[in-house]
A protein has these predicted regions:
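Active-site rim/adjacent substrate-binding subdomains
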Residues: 1-141, 146-174
């Protein structure tokens, strides 16, 4: 496993649609392992393959949401999604603050669906169907947008700069 460089905006790869993964081979497995290590090192809650200069439809997400606002986050769950698509989105939406590892020092207020259903393959090629709500749904939408060449700043209602020490648990970098 290796920590890869994260591509920062502006970069063409961030604005291009990623290619479908046709074969899950050793090279793809290495990329997934590297993406997980890179995301954890950043630190972030999600990373799309184009963010490490790989134009493939792969996303890794690691997140644990507290059951109550006063509690510590639950144990984090790791998701590896190959060729993910959002099959359902709730009509109910919410504006939330997002960061992005490819946009250091930038936060944005983005409206997203409160719940989504994601279909994908896991790293073994087995089909997955995940129903997510809240922050996990937001993270999935953000990362899948990366695979479609859509940047969170394009969906933003407000964009603002922050100092590096202002990034918090409430405003994680995705």
């Amino acid at each position: 496993m290796a920590i890869r460089d994260i591509v920062n905006y502006p970069s063409e790869i961030l604005e291009q649609k990623a290619q479908r993964v046709e074969r899950i081979d050793a090279e793809v497995q290495t990329l997934i392992d590297d993406m997980i290590e890179t995301m954890r090192n950043a630190p972030g809650v999600g990373l799309a393959a184009p963010q490490v200069n790989a134009p493939l439809r792969i996303v890794v997400v690691e997140y644990g949401e507290p059951e109550n606002e006063d509690e510590e986050p639950a144990e984090k769950q790791l998701f590896t999604l190959i060729n993910p698509e959002i099959s359902r989105m709730s009509r109910e939406k919410e504006i939330g603050t997002e960061g992005c590892l490819s946009f250091p020092g930038i936060l944005a207020e983005v409206e997203r669906s409160l719940a989504v259903t994601v279909v994908a393959q896991d790293r073994n090629g087995d089909p997955l169907k995940i129903k997510a709500e809240g922050w996990l749904a937001r993270i999935f939408q953000h990362e899948i947008d990366h695979l479609n060449g859509v940047l969170f700043t394009e969906r933003a209602q407000k964009v603002y700069e922050i100092k590096p020490d202002e990034e918090t648990e409430e405003n994680p970098a995705a």
